[in-house]
Amino acid sequence: MSESVHTNTSLWSKGMKAVIVAQFLSAFGDNALLFATLALLKAQFYPEWSQPILQMVFVGAYILFAPFVGQVADSFAKGRVMMFANGLKLLGAASICFGINPFLGYTLVGVGAAAYSPAKYGILGELTTGSKLVKANGLMEASTIAAILLGSVAGGVLADWHVLVALAACALAYGGAVVANIYIPKLAAARPGQSWNLINMTRSFLNACTSLWRNGETRFSLVGTSLFWGAGVTLRFLLVLWVPVALGITDNATPTYLNAMVAIGIVVGAGAAAKLVTLETVSRCMPAGILIGVVVLIFSLQHELLPAYALLMLIGVLGGFFVVPLNALLQERGKKSVGAGNAIAVQNLGENSAMLLMLGIYSLAVMVGIPVVPIGIGFGALFALAITALWIWQRRH
């Protein structure tokens, strides 16, 4: 058996390096492909309303396949599941390159992403445990954020040069992720021999949801991570409307740069969490979650660019410190109760449902004519109150 299977293995074992590299390339491809495909839609004169549909089919795949992907991750070696999922992403990107309908190709990438997520996080708990698991999550989040930054920029820059080159670069990134997956040790399946009857799988998934919800620690983690990622996506769209109103800047680049500050901050916060928080001290992350809402409220009142940059980076630092320990807690407790793959699949369902819900509420607020600054203030205040309520509940239970 590979040395990386043992719980006392180095955080930089061959298997862990392969996982981190594969995750970086896969996430790089995801983010570059979004901007490259948006450029393709513009070049082919698709209507503007069609652009958000790309994100909807991507998120929709997570929700639709949530009952099944966790069992897939737990029924096979997770490294091989990751390789198969990246292969689907490669096929989706290549199909767009060769002129297949971009929505169909992007849907295929979404299916691959849905299958990939439970395996990529679940395998961390098989390669390492305990305090090293929090550090491994920090590495995973840091590599993901770096890929988001570089992938987004690369997709946009290459698409301005030539859309086909940008799409080909995405396919190449996915191909590199497939190769990296080959170097992950073939670990034993966590829960082999499960039924593949779709009705039974759906029932099993619902049982996993129920089991995780009834456990105080995993429910705490599920609610916390869902609130965080739902708020993160909403903040991204909030910035697009906030920048011209608050700063008087009407270009397309400034909201992108501000979003980048959040991403950079998350890397810093994830690193701090890996050093300062363990599974036994997860509650240390809760004040950071409350402060996210407070800083968003303060940020909404700004009218200068430099303070906006600084506050958004602070939001990112707080966010990374908040979410990484919660992820690790869910993986460790979920692995023992329903399997790590099922736990992450349930988490994906919660997070993506929260994204759709929060974006829907935000869109409704904009639709009825509420100004963006009051929306930002209310958004920050509600998030701080929600995390405070979650912390109080966690302390009582």
Swiss-Prot record:
Subcellular location: Cell inner membrane
Keyword annotations: Cell inner membrane, Cell membrane, Lipid transport, Membrane, Transmembrane, Transmembrane helix, Transport
Regions of this protein lying in the Cytoplasmic compartment: 39-52, 112-144, 188-226, 278-280, 326-343, 388-397
GO molecular function terms noted in the UniProt entry: lysophospholipid:sodium symporter activity
Segments traversing the membrane: 18-38, 53-73, 91-111, 145-165, 167-187, 227-247, 257-277, 281-301, 305-325, 344-364, 367-387
Database matches in Gene3D superfamilies: MFS general substrate transporter like domains
A Pfam family the protein falls into: MFS_1
Periplasmic side: 1-17, 74-90, 166, 248-256, 302-304, 365-366
UniProt main location, coarse: membrane
Superkingdom of origin: Bacteria
Membrane topology term: Multi-pass membrane protein
Entry's Gene Ontology cellular component terms: plasma membrane
Function: Catalyzes the facilitated diffusion of 2-acyl-glycero-3-phosphoethanolamine (2-acyl-GPE) into the cell.
Annotated family: Belongs to the major facilitator superfamily. LplT (TC 2.A.1.42) family.
Name of this chain's protein: Lysophospholipid transporter LplT
Organism: Escherichia coli (strain SMS-3-5 / SECEC)
